[in-house]
Design a protein with these regions (language model features):
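Solvent-exposed, extracytoplasmic
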Residues: 43-59, 90, 119, 123, ...
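Extracytoplasmic/periplasmic sensor domains and loops in membrane signaling proteins
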Residues: 48-50, 75-103, 168-202
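Conserved nucleotide-binding and Mg2+-coordinating catalytic segments in signaling enzymes
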Residues: 274-291
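Juxtamembrane extracytoplasmic/periplasmic/luminal helical "stalk" adjacent to the first N-terminal
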Residues: 1-42
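Cytoplasm-proximal transmembrane signaling helix
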Residues: 232-274
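Extracellular/periplasmic juxtamembrane segments that couple receptor/chemosensory ectodomains to their
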Residues: 178-246
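Amphipathic coiled-coil signal-relay and dimerization helices
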Residues: 66, 70-77, 160-165, 214-215
């Protein structure tokens, strides 16, 4: 039905939107990488100033320049070695990379590292990366859809939650759920996740509540964007929208009809006036001649 179509359409659009946001941040990093490559010393004071300014003017939280040995110099001038990290290894192979999510023990926010290679004369001379708050990214989803009665999230191919809303989980007693497949263990969902396909399925909770689950691939790291909403909420919302659209169409129809009647009436009055003018015009001519 139409509420199902609305859900699928929205989850696909949101997936495309998030993909665009991440790609914009990759673009920022690529521009920064070009500037960093101009200095013979990757860890020069000018480059440190560059990444500090970059961090303050983008949504990336922590920025680092990484040399070929994996030594990372951060914007706060702390140095760590990340040679063992997948994102570093992939970027050293001329690839853009996105790390696995990490939850901060300080603010419980989930962050990922976006990394791009630094080129000079077509050779990779290092890596530049920045951390991005995916919890914040996830909270941007579906804020106004179905009056906030549903919940959006990002999961990996294995169903592990990447973004989560602690307040929502506490309200609905979902704080122990770490994997989507623990809630809805349908073969179709797992197959669609593996094949990176969009769809919508009906699931039943242990409390016999019917829910719609819509999902679509994010096209980065095999992640999926998901949205779950009670069936009654989706259907009620669509019924309201349909009723509203019917009222609006009726109102516009009445306006058009009134306009047609008005124009017809105006045309009739104008015709009568022209006839009246044609009757007095000869008299006027005669009157003008007599004067």
């Amino acid at each position: 039905n139409n509420s199902r179509k609305t859900l699928i359409t929205n989850v696909v659009r949101q997936s495309e939107h998030l993909n665009t946001i991440l790609n914009i941040n990759y673009s920022y990093l690529n521009v920064l990488a070009q500037e960093l490559s101009k200095s013979q010393d990757l860890f020069s004071e000018d480059n440190v100033s560059l990444i500090q300014a970059f961090m303050h003017n983008t949504d990336l939280n922590r920025t680092a320049i990484i040399d070929p040995n994996g030594n990372a110099l951060y914007d706060n001038e702390v140095i760590k070695n990340v040679a063992h990290r997948r994102y570093f290894k992939e970027s050293m192979q001329s690839k853009q990379s996105l790390s696995d999510p990490l939850e901060s023990s300080v603010d419980q926010q989930t962050r990922v590292i976006l990394c791009v290679p630094i080129f000079r004369d077509r050779q990779v001379i290092g890596v530049v990366g920045g951390s991005y708050n995916v919890t914040k990214l996830g909270n941007m989803l579906f804020d106004d859809l179905f009056e906030g009665q549903g919940k959006s999230f990002i999961v990996d191919q294995g169903g592990n939650l990447i973004t989560r809303n602690k307040q929502y989980e506490k309200k609905h007693k979902l704080n122990t759920v770490d994997n989507l497949f623990n809630v809805c263990n349908q073969k179709k969902i797992k197959t669609d996740f593996k094949n990176q396909k969009s769809d919508l399925v009906l699931i039943q909770t242990k409390k016999k509540e019917s829910l719609y689950l819509a999902y679509s691939p994010l096209k980065i790291n095999d992640w999926m964007v998901g949205y779950i909403v009670p069936v009654h909420a989706a259907q009620e919302s669509y019924t309201f929208i349909t009723h509203y659209e019917t009222l609006l169409a009726t109102f516009l129809g009445l306006i058009v009809l009134s306009l047609i009647v008005y124009l017809a009436h105006s045309s009739s009055r104008e015709n009568k006036y022209l006839i009246h003018l044609s009757e007095i015009d000869p008299l006027t001519s005669v009157f003008n001649k007599e004067t």
